Amino acid sequence: MRTSHLAAGMVVLCISMACRDRRPTVLDIASPDTQVIADGRSTLRLPLRNANGDEPDARELTVKLLSENGHGKASVEGSPASLVYRAGVMPGTVTMQISGKYVSPATVTIATTPDYSDSFGDGAPDFLRLDSVTDRQAFRHWFTAIAEHEAFAGSKLPAEINDCAALLRYSYREALRRHDAAWAKAANLGELRAAADVAKYQYPYTPVGPRLFRVQEGSFVARDLTDGTFAEFADVKTLVLSNAQFISRDVHRALPGDLIFYRQFEQQSRFHSMIFVGSSSFGPGDDWVVYHTGPDGSWPGEIRRVQLSALITHPDPRWRPVPGNRNFLGVYRWNILREVQ
């Protein structure tokens, strides 16, 4: 029995010493033989092997993207292990570093090329379009939740929200941000429940930077990025006609985040838009609409929250979103929500 215990102890000791003596191995990363399009969709897989020919364990490896925001995401996956790079929307040089407990840190650099395509010819570059169902759902959730929240903001309403266009711009921009604790504190939006963010990109890390809105007509071309075609400010007419698509004059076809658009011929500020929220983030009901009245003389205006059923029977027929009202131009949907096939 003593011999048995001694042998067992030697085995444990040998295993322990072997672990301590294990030296980091050099990792071989297959060189990329192609450029990647910075379209927010493309994927590149690079097989990984240890220099001694062994296959590394993906669970023992970590990868870090050394490039700035907007350049994509990287992970180590599979068996045999591969470095998987998922393109962002910012073109340029992307460097990734792989390391592990028993692997010497290694880096690989790839080049990503710009994506200037515009699948619909509507002026929105494809790199801004939200290709996945989950991203479109995330945008709709945040856009409507933020707009609806501001209806309850009172004195905490951001100063920039002073008319219907400003409410659209603010809610659109904030919906595309990363929604962490720092954002919630800075925007006074801590009451909103946690939800998934848009994954393809986050504002302002895209080729248009903070200039989200198209202010000139036409299909997208590369020079639009530098010639003033995109801007941070756009009035409501430009927001809707140059950044959204017509859906229907049947308001019941509106989805959460769609715009209800009017032209009031009798008013000085002729164009007006409302946001169809649908189901509320703050209470019962599934047909809520939020809008800013705009200023009237010395009155700064206010954000109102009404149900679509009430709007359809509005005392003033000019505000009823029904086909028989010539002032109602229809339901519009943001171009970034158009589905690229």
Where are the language model's segments positioned?
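Low-complexity "stalk/linker" and mucin-like segments enriched in Ser/Thr/Pro/Ala/Gly
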Residues: 64-80
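A short beta-turn/strand-edge loop motif at beta-sheet boundaries
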Residues: 52-59
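Short S/T/G/P-enriched beta-strand
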Residues: 20-52, 105-116
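N-terminal capping segments
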Residues: 114-230
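Extracellular/luminal low-complexity segments enriched in Ser/Thr/Pro
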Residues: 79-92
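Low-complexity, Gly/Ser/Thr/Pro-rich intrinsically disordered linker/tail segments
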Residues: 286-341
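A short beta-strand micro-motif common to beta-rich folds, especially ectodomain repeats
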Residues: 91-101
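...with weaker cross-activation on analogous glycine-rich loops/strands in unrelated enzymes
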Residues: 192-298
